[in-house]
């Protein structure tokens, strides 16, 4: 995952600030927008966890501060629910102009309600997910119900929410009064996922039921059992992100990852403008390789030498476990820690003139289990019998030839 700071203008020309999270290969299949809760901001830990889950599934996620909150310009006292909706529309327009039109809209609490209103105004949105969303915007006034009389009398009041003071004006409440979510949801006709915790004491579970009843199919409900309203537990927000990612893949278009084809076991592909960030297909698995930032890379994946060390580590643990199981020895866990010492930067500078350097792998093995010293010594010997270990020690030939671009019709898949 990589993070970009972005800025765009809202309807009033004020600057809104956000973060765009990209998947590790920098090639998202879809873009999503996340709307944070009332008086929250883009940096809520739960939002980051949900974003991380989505980027791990190939989505790019834009999370930003609504007008008057966080890093964004504007005075919160002059904002309202309609303004939040317009901010989401502005965010979608920014993505469409600079990246790609968003297809997934996610909102938490009042941000979820705003997402439902905004989805009706953003043609590119193909799916909407809400988390702990109220079934009507006016629900939020319960947070300052003791101040309603003061608002009616003087036109505004100061309320303390989450340890911070916020000025709420009468125009904010008037705007809420004019919003009806059930009618918007009924007319939305876009796939909807509703996530809500039964124990939510800020926005009761009844709200989820009312949204669900108002919506047309396809609609889904997922219970976030045991979670609080802000999804403070990491496992709750991560779960929500994984569910949203899996569910939305049914409704947004995801191109098949068939770019990399080969008749061999592994293929690596690197475009001219991608630096060292390399797309790879290893058997049936896709991954990204890169170089560290101090070598001029972006560190979006393991380096070539790290992959080589990984091969030795993986082969060693597999060989040890296979041997100990055959011997019926009690080994609960094997870990192999491997480092390669020769600097890749030095290799590259001297690769055509200096082949005398010794490649050294430092390998440390930890064993958890009921083993005596004789067994441990034998396992240490077995580690050297790992096939990759033998390959690294043996005389190896690499046969290289230039061929025409690979014809995908010849691929094994």
Regions from the PLM with identified roles:
Residues 46, 78-98:
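Alpha/beta-hydrolase active-site loop
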Residues 188, 194-196, 200:
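Short beta-strand/loop motif that positions the catalytic acidic residue
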Residues 123-171:
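Hydrolase active-site cap/lid region
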